[in-house]
């Protein structure tokens, strides 16, 4: 019996690794989440091992050897930094704010301040570093032996680093691998790694560079043409709008799109997810499923938890209104539909409540973890199954479930 051809798509998060097997047309055969050991993920000398071990555990969970793997594509959060020396690692996670630098700097780079944190607070680690990678870049290195820095699009260079700025802060560019573009083929999976996945060591499986999770999520929701909107939530929540020019208004953040000449404008709600989780963890719902908790709150509107979700939903409504106001200046669209991704997209009760409060149509795609679909789109574009990321996204991203206001 012929095996189904799939891309093995990986996204490295802060507390877990997500993975899925996705076909050329966007069908998700299987998916899994591997939680990192809470003890190891807090140890900077073990974090990178957590990623590596979780990758192989995900492969085992998905039974990847039962499929014909045609590609692997990896994304992850940033700016996480992993120093590598003699096969030993030290990782400074993107959200580790336990340290500071003597003289804070003004820069557009999100990486240089983190590099300086590493340099000033861990001088011995810094001096012994052979090279420094992000999370996905480290896993790519482990699988292929290739050292790369993934630049999502040329306009992102200010958010990364330029040689002049590295010189100014006495950071050796030899520590930082050369830039490669999104989708770059880093190499093939080493035979010993294939064997750990119960795949023949002679098989040639290319590993493609997915890059930052924010970028792959925008690709995986097809937020790639002017007027498209997606709502990406986790500990924070970002409402994203694809535009043809930056929007210079208070509260809006502008970044390049992966589509040349386009931009992504986002309106950020910094702590919506965190606030709800903090309440949940301090209540009798601490160890119970999110969906059961939301269902209870919707039936018990006098509960403190309901007041929190009602407050959050109204903040989201206000953010949607701000984004839609800008969308209407860009397009003539009347039928507004917003694609939602992240943990929220897997919770039907929350999605319906959100639709009721915002009075908008909300969509969940065939892959609610949009980062994984973004990786599949990148892989299939590089495999020449599609002529561009945009063409692949148009075919592979499908609205699987629509939530319409009922109240």
Regions found by a protein language model. Name each.
Residues 220-226, 378-383:
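Alpha-helix C-terminal capping segments
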Residues 22-23, 82-85, 118-119, 141-144, ...:
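Short beta-strand-to-turn element immediately C-terminal to the catalytic PLP-Schiff-base lysine
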Residues 48-62, 161-165, 315-322:
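Short, well-ordered amphipathic alpha-helical segments that serve as non-catalytic structural scaffolds
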Residues 30-67, 102-107:
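N-terminal phosphate-binding loop and adjacent alpha-helix
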Residues 5-11, 68-75, 91-92, 132, ...:
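Short glycine-aspartate micro-motif
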Residues 12-14, 106-204, 208-212:
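Gly/Ser/Thr-rich active-site cleft segment
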Residues 104-116, 196-201, 228-230, 381-396:
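A polyampholytic, Gly/Pro-enriched intrinsically disordered region
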Residues 1-34, 39, 70, 74-103, ...:
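Glycine/Thr-rich phosphate-binding loops that ligate phosphate moieties of nucleotide
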